[in-house]
């Protein structure tokens, strides 16, 4: 077994060796050991791939929409990814610092990436003909990466499954759900017996009406009978406590340390490959990983390989940048737990033993103020280089770092305590935003759902967002501060990069006064300006490519007097 060469320090290497060994034995002996070993891995590669890559549209969902059903279902006859190299994929994952790989064995379109004996709609009947899953499973075993599969419960292609494309909106003429359920059991058993033991079987598509709680619970028990230490996600069934862990999608999950969870997110915008898709920056990728782990979760980061079988080179480069960062700072990620400080848009924390790693992602002020700890701080150091000054009182912990020592992506402060950090109850940080928790309103809310209400942009939680309906091109988002407040800085974080023109305004005697105009917002937008005093502030979106959605809208007061940090 080989291990990732990025973790060069003895401490980190020891952690990684223990984690990988736990999974490669060949799998942990018990279910609880399997869950703990998986939580320690922290970072995995998600792969959505199939014949649909020939069209560059979304897997499953574009069947019957952008691509006619008849054409979509014939794509496999032209699928010949001659440049596919399992070693290259797995090496990329390993050098990115990833510890497990999840492949779409079957998505909602029904196509199988292994030569299943229960259908003819599989990789063996393409011009390519090779068993992609076999090659990937073998490469993962060689490199110490845990091999896992994604398997869709719904199947819009299979005649026995009641619903069809587009998107499960049509009904098939002669469905037979009990027979389809047996097909599903046969295929998942086939995968475990031929490619296992697996780390995870990652289900999806459980939301549709044909799938019931009874089906889900039976499948879960059936698979645990085949492989007791198999980890299964919550989408196997219905209900808040289904499966072994939760799976927030395309968002950073809320801080949660009482049940395992994993954010699944795309490196670009589409799950399957799309030409010239918008890709996340190095900063956004690394900070996403840090925020997820700081919330006590894992990150399953998705790529969609091209039709020739390669992962797009620019995506490989981005993943390797993450690996380079983890080579330096992996000790703050692998084998840690989230907290004790709850994650915000500007800060995350992880801990192991008597050590807390404070990840400062954005300097909102000259210092960072944290809630007091019930344990003493023995020492403090700056892992990213330079000096740090920490002042602890009964009311707060204040951290100061000279500006030249602040890392543009993540300034990491290591705090050594006089006792274990694990027994410290999670601590919420005071918000730096004057808008946090204030009354909010908006011109449009996605499906009138409270889950996407305007308040989500002002909750200081990077995992929730205000969203608008599909097709909305103009919208506004307003906050009432309760009383006039002085602000000198606005910070915005947008999902999906849809805004093309906007203005920031404040209310003055019944009129809206514009104090800033801009075009794109993107993942991270900051505007500083001469202080203004107002009670009502709004973001007025004048032009967007589709329904705008905002993670965070923060209003900051003028900076306080600087906290002097001596070398």
Predicted segments with their positions:
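Bacterial N-terminal signal peptides that target proteins for export
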Residues: 1-13
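Bacterial N-terminal signal peptides
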Residues: 12-22
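Mature catalytic domains of secreted/periplasmic carbohydrate-active enzymes
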Residues: 27-446, 491-494, 500, 506, ...
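Acidic, glycine-anchored loop motifs typical of Ca2+
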Residues: 456-462
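Tryptophan-centered short beta-strand motifs
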Residues: 512-514
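Short beta-strand edge segments in extracellular beta-sheet folds
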Residues: 554-556
């Amino acid at each position: 077994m080989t291990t990732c060469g990025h973790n060069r320090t003895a401490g980190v290497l020891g952690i990684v060796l223990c984690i990988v060994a736990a999974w490669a034995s060949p799998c942990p002996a018990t279910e609880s050991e399997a869950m703990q070993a998986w939580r320690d891995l922290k970072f995995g590669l998600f792969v959505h791939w199939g014949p649909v890559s020939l069209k560059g549209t979304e897997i499953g969902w574009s069947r019957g929409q952008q691509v006619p059903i008849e054409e979509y279902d014939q794509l496999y006859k032209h699928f010949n990814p001659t440049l596919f190299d399992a070693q290259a994929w797995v090496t990329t994952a390993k050098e990115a610092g990833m510890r497990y790989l999840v492949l779409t064995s079957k998505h909602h379109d029904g196509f199988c990436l292994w030569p299943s004996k229960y259908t003819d709609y599989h990789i063996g009947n393409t011009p390519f003909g090779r068993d992609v899953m076999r090659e990937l499973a073998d490469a993962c075993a060689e490199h110490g990466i845990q091999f896992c599969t994604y398997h869709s419960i719904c199947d819009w292609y299979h005649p026995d499954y009641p619903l069809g494309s587009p998107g499960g909106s049509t009904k098939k003429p002669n469905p037979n759900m009990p027979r389809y359920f047996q097909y599903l059991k046969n295929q998942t058993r086939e995968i475990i017996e031929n490619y296992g033991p697996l780390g995870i079987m990652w289900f999806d598509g459980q939301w549709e009406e044909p799938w019931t709680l009874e089906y889900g619970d039976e499948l879960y028990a059936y698979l645990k009978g085949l492989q007791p230490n198999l980890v299964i996600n919550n989408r196997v069934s219905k209900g808040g406590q289904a499966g072994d862990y939760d799976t927030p999608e395309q968002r950073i999950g809320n801080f949660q340390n009482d049940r395992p969870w994993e954010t699944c997110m795309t490196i670009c915008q589409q799950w399957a490959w799309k030409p010239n898709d918008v890709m996340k920056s190095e900063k956004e990728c690394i900070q996403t990983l840090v925020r997820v782990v700081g919330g006590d979760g894992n990150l399953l980061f998705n790529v969609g390989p091209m039709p020739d079988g390669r992962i797009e080179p620019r995506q490989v480069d981005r993943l390797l940048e993450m690996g380079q960062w983890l080579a330096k700072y992996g000790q703050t990620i692998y084998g840690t737990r989230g907290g004790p400080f709850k994650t915000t848009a500007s800060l995350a924390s992880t801990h192991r033993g008597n050590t807390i790693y404070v990840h400062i992602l954005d300097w909102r002020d000259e210092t960072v103020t944290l809630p007091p700890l019930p344990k003493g701080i023995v020492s403090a150091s700056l892992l990213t280089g330079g000096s740090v000054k920490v002042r602890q009182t009964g009311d707060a912990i204040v951290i100061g770092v000279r500006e030249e020592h602040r890392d543009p992506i993540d300034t990491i402060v290591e705090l050594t305590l006089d006792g274990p950090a694990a027994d410290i109850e999670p601590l919420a940080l005071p918000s730096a935003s004057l808008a946090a928790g204030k009354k909010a309103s908006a011109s449009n809310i996605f499906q009138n759902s409270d889950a996407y209400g305007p308040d989500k942009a002002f909750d200081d939680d990077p995992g929730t967002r205000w969203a608008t309906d599909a097709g909305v091109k103009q919208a506004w988002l307003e906050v009432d501060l309760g009383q006039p407040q002085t602000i000198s800085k606005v910070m915005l974080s947008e999902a999906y990069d849809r805004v093309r023109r906007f203005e920031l305004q404040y209310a003055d005697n019944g009129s809206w006064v514009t104090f800033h105009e801009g075009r794109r917002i993107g993942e991270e937008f900051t505007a500083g300006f001469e202080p203004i005093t107002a009670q009502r502030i709004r973001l007025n979106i004048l032009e967007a490519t589709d329904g705008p959605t905002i993670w965070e809208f923060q209003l900051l007061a003028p900076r306080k007097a600087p906290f002097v940090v001596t070398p």
